[in-house]
Curated annotation (Swiss-Prot):
Subcellular localization: Cytoplasm
GO annotation terms (biological process): L-histidine biosynthetic process
GO cellular component terms, A-Z: cytoplasm
Family indicated by similarity: Belongs to the PRA-PH family.
Gene name linked to the record: hisE
Keywords attached to this entry: Amino-acid biosynthesis, ATP-binding, Cytoplasm, Histidine biosynthesis, Hydrolase, Nucleotide-binding
Enzyme class, first EC level, given as a word: hydrolase
Pathway: Amino-acid biosynthesis; L-histidine biosynthesis; L-histidine from 5-phospho-alpha-D-ribose 1-diphosphate: step 2/9
Record protein name field: Phosphoribosyl-ATP pyrophosphatase
EC nos: 3.6.1.31
Main location per the UniProt record: cytoplasm
């Protein structure tokens, strides 16, 4: 099972190795503006799932929000440690 750190390391490895056909690589090649819009979209889906959907659907939406937040972290050069100091 993945956690925040293991997901980050998986995504960072993809960013470094740039495997062909990777959705993460495609996302990293897009602008921060585009990635920011994706985070906003996913945050809205988390809210809607919290209001109207099952716990499983909510968990899935939260996982997608975490993914996109980490893509932005990697694009900007942040690590989990940079985030943890604010938790």
């Amino acid at each position: 099972m993945k956690n925040f750190d293991s997901l980050y390391h998986e995504l960072a490895e993809r960013a470094e190795k740039r495997p062909e056909g990777s959705g993460t690589v495609a996302a990293l090649n897009s602008s921060l503006h585009t990635l920011g819009k994706k985070v906003i979209e996913e945050a809205g889906e988390v809210w809607l799932a919290a209001e109207y959907q099952s716990d499983a659907e909510l968990a899935e939406e939260i996982s997608q929000l975490m993914y996109w937040a980490q893509v932005i972290m990697i694009k900007r050069g942040l690590t989990p440690e940079d985030i943890y100091k604010y938790l």
